[in-house]
């Protein structure tokens, strides 16, 4: 008699995705982040659900309801900080996952990659609308500044901004709709993640060498299930350490002041995971130009498969490309740092240079390095 997991219509899908899935025998820990992102998503949905049970999306009570969750609800402070720091862990895993894809040429699976870029944009949108919900100073002014960027769109910009706000400023209507978006988006992310996985399983996983994986495959379970559990435990350990020892490490103190439309914080800045894009936005002294650079800094990922010039898929055996890749990582860290600094002398020019270098590396230097490496190998 055949095992039920291979015959039952539902079990068969799960079996083919997580148990009998043929997986390359040599994938490293960089391949752990996919499952960790799934874990993050589940954690965020669960903690978010419990927070939504006690939260009120209304300008007069939103801030108080978050304070009520932290003070009066059993383990409310824990759920709230798990959710806030869980978002940071989510982005750490996301950026590691994307970095892995860039380094090992996983972007050559174009459908999987494009759904991945769409997922990144959706997660960023979710995090942005979620940050507005506690209705602190940074929530309010962050929402005002970022939504206002749409007014840079010629002709329809101002109308579009007022349509999103539901009025002439960020107010009650804005908060209510942002809560609605924040509730629905994670389920859209879940659906997109399923499609992401569907496309991945059409081709099978890439591996560090970049050569076809079908040479040597092993079943996903038990080899990679145990490896994923180790990764999950490390993720949970890090998240718990962050949540229980320094819950406010990554937050902004301004968000502990209730939103006040009459007083602007000294430095308006987003959460750390958006700082690199914020630095690129600020480095261009023109509203429309800045908005376009901001969009392009993320959407550039879509064009990466087209910029592949090397005949080798992975960077594993390409020292020149490796050097440029790590320069890109250093550049992104520099941009993240600059995004959190005030707009004054040394920071402005450093931000502008780092922004130029970011686009130069991806659009010019890395494709050129690929061609040089082909020549060096007499290809």
Swiss-Prot record:
Residues recorded as binding a ubiquinone, renumbered to this chain, are 201
Cofactor(s) listed: heme b
Question: What main location does UniProt list?
Answer: mitochondrion
Q: Where are the transmembrane segments?
A: 33-53, 77-98, 113-133, 178-198, 226-246, 288-308, 320-340, 347-367
| InterPro entries for the chain | Cyt_b/b6_C, Cyt_b/b6_C_sf, Cyt_b/b6_N, Cytb/b6-like_sf, Cytochrome_b, Cytochrome_b_C_euk/bac, Cytochrome_b_N_euk/bac, Di-haem_cyt_TM
User: Subunit comment for this entry?
Assistant: The cytochrome bc1 complex contains 11 subunits: 3 respiratory subunits (MT-CYB, CYC1 and UQCRFS1), 2 core proteins (UQCRC1 and UQCRC2) and 6 low-molecular weight proteins (UQCRH/QCR6, UQCRB/QCR7, UQCRQ/QCR8, UQCR10/QCR9, UQCR11/QCR10 and a cleavage product of UQCRFS1). This cytochrome bc1 complex then forms a dimer.
- State what protein this is by name: Cytochrome b
Organism from which the protein derives: Sousa chinensis
This protein's gene is called MT-CYB
């Amino acid at each position: 008699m055949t095992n039920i997991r291979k015959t039952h219509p539902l079990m068969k899908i799960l079996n083919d995705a997580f148990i009998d899935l043929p997986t390359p025998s040599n994938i490293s820990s960089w391949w752990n982040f996919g499952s960790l992102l799934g874990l993050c998503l589940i954690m965020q949905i669960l903690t978010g659900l419990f927070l939504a049970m006690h939260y009120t999306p209304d300008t007069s009570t939103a801030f108080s309801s978050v304070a009520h969750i932290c003070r009066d609800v059993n383990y409310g402070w824990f759920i709230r900080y798990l959710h806030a720091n869980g978002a940071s862990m989510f982005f750490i895993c996301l950026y590691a996952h994307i970095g892995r894809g860039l380094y090992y040429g996983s972007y050559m699976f174009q459908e999987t990659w494009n759904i991945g870029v769409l997922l990144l944009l959706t997660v960023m949108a979710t995090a942005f609308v979620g940050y507005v919900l506690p209705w602190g100073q940074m929530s309010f002014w962050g929402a005002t500044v970022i939504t206002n960027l749409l007014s840079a769109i010629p002709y329809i910009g101002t109308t579009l901004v007022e349509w999103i706000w539901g009025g002439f400023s960020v107010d009650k209507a804005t908060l209510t709709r942002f809560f609605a978006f924040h509730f629905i988006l994670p389920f859209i992310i879940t659906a997109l993640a399923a499609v992401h996985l569907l496309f991945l399983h059409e081709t099978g996983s890439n591996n560090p060498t970049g050569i076809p994986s079908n040479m040597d495959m092993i079943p996903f379970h038990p080899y990679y299930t145990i490896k994923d559990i180790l990764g999950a435990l490390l993720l949970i350990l890090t998240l718990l350490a962050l949540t229980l020892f320094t819950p406010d490490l990554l937050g902004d103190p301004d968000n502990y002041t209730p939103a006040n439309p009459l007083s602007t914080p000294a430095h308006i800045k987003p959460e750390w995971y958006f700082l690199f894009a914020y630095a690129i936005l600020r480095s261009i002294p023109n509203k429309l130009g800045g908005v376009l650079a901001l969009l392009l800094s993320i959407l550039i990922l879509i064009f990466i498969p087209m910029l592949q010039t090397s005949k080798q898929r992975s960077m594993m055996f390409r020292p020149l490309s490796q050097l440029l890749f790590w320069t890109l990582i250093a550049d992104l860290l520099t941009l993240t740092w600059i995004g959190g600094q005030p707009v004054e002398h040394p920071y402005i020019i450093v931000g502008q240079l780092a922004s130029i270098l970011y686009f130069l590396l991806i659009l010019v230097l890395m494709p050129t390095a690929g061609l040089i490496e082909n020549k060096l190998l007499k290809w």
